[in-house]
């Protein structure tokens, strides 16, 4: 499951679609993530996306709008807001 998420985090992954992919119930997936990672599936995906974006911002001259898209965000304003919150949390 984790490798699938790590390979596809840039795409939209809903709990329902994820469950269908692995033939698991949404409830089981939610419980699994809470028990093993202490976060939800969507929080895990957000973390992967933001860490990917952070790496691109540090290592490339790619514009923020492009980095947002490459990290799975269609709305640049939302990406910037979430990214700032994530960076403040890490301080």
Predicted feature descriptions by range:
Residues 3, 7, 12-16, 35-77:
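Terminal helix-turn-helix DNA-binding modules in bacterial transcription factors
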Residues 21-22, 71:
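Core residues of bacterial helix-turn-helix
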Residues 29, 33, 78-79, 83:
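Short hydrophobic/aromatic patch on the recognition helix
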Residues 81-91:
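…primarily DNA-binding HTH/wHTH and HhH modules…
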